[in-house]
A protein has these predicted regions:
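Alpha-helical scaffold/interaction cores of sigma-54-like transcription cofactors
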Residues: 1-6, 97-101, 112
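Acidic, glycine-rich two-metal-ion catalytic cores of nucleic acid-processing enzymes
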Residues: 1-79, 142-209, 221-229
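Catalytic palm subdomain of template-directed nucleic-acid polymerases
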Residues: 48, 100-113, 209-226
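Short Gly/aromatic-enriched secondary-structure transition segments
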Residues: 51, 117-120
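Residue-level preference for well-ordered alpha-helical positions
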Residues: 72-77, 94, 105, 109, ...
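Short, surface-exposed acidic
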Residues: 76-87, 111-118, 129-132
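Short, amphipathic alpha-helical "recognition" segments used to contact nucleic acids or chromatin
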Residues: 87-97
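Polymerase palm active-site segment centered on the conserved acidic dipeptide of motif C
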Residues: 120-138, 216-229
Length: 229
């Protein structure tokens, strides 16, 4: 497992398969079975909304909006392009993973000046997120006694503590969100087991759970998953 408690799979690395169909099409269900997937639909951004309690972010989710569509619409206008949505999505994950402006610009394929301006607009749109991130850094530093050579810590949704190097206190945001997502995922695996899907569980890929069920049980499995998610 990763430091945050996020599950990690190696040999083969099924969570990081190459994009495209060549490799992925090699993974098939057994005869008489099919795959049924439970998807948490942008869990990390939802956890960010929960922790930050940002009013605009919570309102967008309450309306059932796709958050990245919402950001693109607010910043670029209602006729935003696919590329502009990608930039909006990259900005959200740059916040979660602590990426600086140069990294965000490179990932989003925009210049640094444009990336800087975009992040300023993003912070204006979601001021609660900026405040939350600053508070996490401050908490880590305070718990380290203000000494950058020491460790502070962050708390996950279940109260578990994760140590964070004070010199890299910004990582506390990612640890708190990713670690909390890992807890939610594992709790959901246990819940699905209690609902009878345990024997069919095959793989957890971060915010997705993959089940291999007999064809005659596929619809029942789908209903169970929909009710539980």
């Amino acid at each position: 497992a990763a430091r945050t408690g996020r599950m990690s799979i190696t040999d083969p690395p099924l969570q990081t398969l190459p994009r495209g169909r060549v490799v992925r099409d090699a993974i098939v269900a057994r005869p008489g079975h099919c795959f049924v997937m439970a998807d948490f639909a942008g869990m990390e951004m939802r956890v960010m909304a929960s922790f930050s309690q940002d009013a605009n972010m919570l309102a967008a989710y309450a309306r059932g909006e796709d958050l990245h569509d919402f950001v693109a619409k607010e910043i670029y206008g209602i006729r935003f392009t696919k590329q502009e949505r990608t930039v909006s999505k990259n900005a959200g994950f740059a916040k979660i993973y602590g990426a600086g402006i140069p990294k965000f610009a490179a990932t989003a394929k925009i210049d640094v000046q444009t990336a800087t301006a975009f992040m300023e607009q993003y912070d204006s749109l979601f001021p609660g997120v900026k405040t939350f991130m600053e508070s996490v850094v401050a908490e880590v530093m305070e718990r380290a006694g203000g000494d950058r050579r020491k460790y502070g810590y962050i708390e996950l949704i279940d109260g578990r503590r994760l140590p964070v190097e004070a010199d890299e206190a910004y990582k506390g945001v990612n640890y708190r969100i990713q670690g909390s997502c890992a807890i939610v995922t594992k709790e959901k695996i246990v819940e699905m087991d209690a609902l009878g899907l345990g024997p069919y569980f095959r793989l957890a890929v971060h915010d997705e759970l993959l089940y291999e069920v007999p064809l005659e049980l596929a619809e029942d499995a789908r209903r169970v998953i929909e009710a539980a998610m």
